[in-house]
From Swiss-Prot:
One of its GO terms (molecular function) is biotin synthase activity. Belongs to the radical SAM superfamily. Biotin synthase family. It comes from Arabidopsis thaliana. PANTHER family: BIOTIN SYNTHASE, BIOTIN SYNTHASE, MITOCHONDRIAL. Pathway: Cofactor biosynthesis; biotin biosynthesis; biotin from 7,8-diaminononanoate: step 2/2. The gene is BIO2. This is Biotin synthase, mitochondrial. GO terms for cellular component: mitochondrion. One of its GO terms (biological process) is biotin biosynthetic process. Residues 357-378 are annotated as: Disordered.
Length: 378
């Protein structure tokens, strides 16, 4: 009798009205459930409709979190979280008008324009990051593009070679790049190139006017064609609607190949920028973005990025459960505050997380082939 009762109870779930529903009826209420099951069964796909992604995004939050976790555990080691460090190697003085950015020369934010950091300073920072547990070192320069920056670009190529030689993944975000520059970055050993789309195509002109959405997509195409991993995500909290968040995810999920890395940033409003009065992003908004990204781009590294400093350890744990498997660690993310190494080590210990080792998918023959292409195109 006890066994019968147990089985009977396991097949029934409470409904919103207080009655009982069968488990199959309950699960059919959620698009997250259906799409997660399909993703697990069929693997990644690039033909998502905007309505499909909206249905996943709009699923009940706890259901979305649960099914994001299902997909995450199916594709990844759910305890592994990669630690990355992002260093601003050329700070301030940017000519663009990105309304969230304290490095724009158009705003009075207290950020002073600086020259490119020396090789010794950059390598020292990379060594400290590695000692603290980071396996990916990212270098950011406050530039619109790399045109006319031949000397600085050549220096950065040397930085990449040396840091890659330390056994770390290397990522750069240097603004827009051309095909030839992408090939040279590949030849130097660059693992990934970051170029965020920031928001939906529709909302984008409200955030930036000095670089078009298609400019960003063109850079991603150059990166992909060069054989470099694509790192591209966005920022929430810019004043956009939920439809714009869905639009961002739809654009990323329908690229010819999904980005290997999808950073989800929560705006940290900086005084002096046009968005200084934006209200802080709530953790539930982050969870919804992360869970949806995990279901529609199952193999991507979903990176819990800027704004993490505002979330408690408990809140971050929910993000990892929903599908995030990477963080940026260190005192600063470019010029904004971030969680320091010690705090993150404590979090890893408390949550039972395991540092993800570096991953080098490119073999030597690929690098050699790319080197030949780069040489031939000079």
């Amino acid at each position: 009798m006890m066994l019968v009762r147990s089985v009977f109870r396991s097949q029934l779930r409470p409904s919103v009205s207080g009655g009982l529903q069968s488990a199959s009826c309950y699960s059919s209420l959620s698009a997250a459930s259906a799409e997660a099951e399909r993703t697990i069964r069929e693997g990644p796909r690039n033909d998502w409709s905007r309505d499909e992604i909206k249905s996943v995004y709009d699923s009940p939050l706890l259901d979305l979190l649960f099914h994001g976790a299902q997909v995450h555990r199916h594709v990844h080691n759910f305890r592994e979280v990669q630690q990355c460090t992002l260093l601003s190697i050329k700070t301030g003085g940017c000519s663009e008008d990105c309304s969230y950015c304290p490095q724009s020369s158009r705003y009075s934010t207290g950020v002073k324009a600086q020259r490119l950091m020396s090789k010794d300073a950059v390598i020292d920072a990379a060594k400290k990051a590695k000692e603290a547990g980071s396996t990916r070192f990212c270098m950011g320069a406050a530039w619109r593009d790399t045109i006319g920056r031949k000397t600085n670009f050549s220096q950065i190529l040397e930085y990449i070679k040396e840091i890659r030689g330390m056994g770390m993944e290397v990522c750069c975000t240097l603004g827009m790049i051309e095909k030839q520059q992408a090939l040279e970055l590949k030849k130097a050993g660059l693992t990934a190139y970051n170029h965020n789309l920031d928001t939906s195509r529709e909302y984008y002109p409200n955030v930036i006017t000095t670089r078009s959405y298609d400019d960003r997509l063109e850079t991603l195409s150059h990166v992909r064609d060069a054989g470099i991993n694509v790192c591209s995500g966005g920022i929430i909290g810019l004043g956009e609607a939920e439809e714009d968040r869905i639009g961002l995810l739809h654009t990323l999920a329908t690229l010819p190949s999904h980005p290997e890395s999808v950073p989800i940033n929560a705006l940290l409003a900086v005084k002096g920028t046009p968005l200084e009065d934006q209200k802080p992003v709530e953790i539930w908004e982050m969870i919804r973005m992360i869970g949806t990204a995990r279901i529609v781009m199952p193999k991507a590294m979903v990176r819990l990025s800027a704004g993490r400093v505002r979330f408690s350890m408990s809140e971050q744990a929910l993000c990892f459960l929903a599908g995030a498997n990477s963080i940026f660690t260190g005192e600063k993310l470019l010029t904004t505050p971030n969680n320091d190494f010690d705090a993150d080590q404590l979090m890893f210990k408390t949550l039972g997380l395991i540092p993800k080792p570096p991953s080098f998918s490119e073999d030597d023959s690929e690098s050699e082939n790319c080197e030949k292409v780069a040489s031939a195109s000079h």
